[in-house]
Amino acid sequence: MDNRPIGFMDSGVGGLTVVKTAQKLLPNEEIIFIGDEARMPYGPRPTAEVVEFSRQMASFLMTKNIKALVIACNTATNAALAVLQAELPIPVIGVILPGAIAANRQTKNQKIGVIATLGTIKSEAYPKALAEINTKLRAYPVACQEFVEIAEKNELHTTAAQKVMNEKLAEFRQDQIDTLILGCTHFPLLEEGIQAAVGPDVTLVDPGVETVHQLIEILTKQALQHAEGPKAQDQYYSTGNIKNFEEIARTFLNQDLRVEEVKID
């Protein structure tokens, strides 16, 4: 048993979608989350910059004595997963490979759409991961940077947001995909609108769910589970825009939580 907390990090509020799954499947675990609101979005930034920001976020979480780290951000996973795995003395997992594994399990026609930030799409991280798992899979990637802004502004259910989603995802109709990877942790916040845009016959895959299952496996194999019984309260930190972050977090997680501001540079 190991009662230390688990660290989660993201460029903004999107990582809360992974946290929500973790709180459901790992109710005994203490979670410490940090969102880099001051410097988001990560998607358009150079890889070297994302690596540096990821190091800084991980360093902050390490001061909280975490026992494992989840990079709850696709852009940061692509840029910094291998770096942080090499540099940190604890298990570090990302969201890309778990997402590809889940999509391969779901698809029936081997046609898989991928929506993500510009950085993740340009890196071809998901097509590469899918090809490693199953060479018969065909990936159809589309950059949807605008979706991040919709989520961060908490405009999830507006008519304007649905119009943007309909326009960006229209091409998937002719591609005849049957599975769509939500390749940015912000995107499950827009799940309802995305499903409406692509139609009911397309299965949406949230990589965060598979990521938490992998986390459970690691905690079990390495005897890192938290003991049953009372645990410390989960902690939430943001590098900027506390009010907006807190509002989204409280609504999405359905908790009366408090977010603390932290300066990282």
UniProtKB/Swiss-Prot annotation:
Enzyme class, first EC level, given as a word: isomerase
Gene Ontology biological-process entries: cell wall organization; peptidoglycan biosynthetic process; regulation of cell shape
Residues bound to substrate: D10, S11, Y42, G43, N74, T75, T185, H186
Matching Gene3D superfamilies: 3.40.50.1860
Catalytic activity as recorded in UniProt: L-glutamate = D-glutamate
Pathway: Cell wall biogenesis; peptidoglycan biosynthesis
A single GO molecular function term of this UniProt record: glutamate racemase activity
Active site positions: C73 (proton donor/acceptor), C184 (proton donor/acceptor)
Keywords of the record: Cell shape, Cell wall biogenesis/degradation, Isomerase, Peptidoglycan synthesis
UniProt EC number: 5.1.1.3
Membership in a protein family: Belongs to the aspartate/glutamate racemases family.
Role, per record: Provides the (R)-glutamate required for cell wall biosynthesis.
Designated name of the protein: Glutamate racemase
Gene expressing this chain: murI
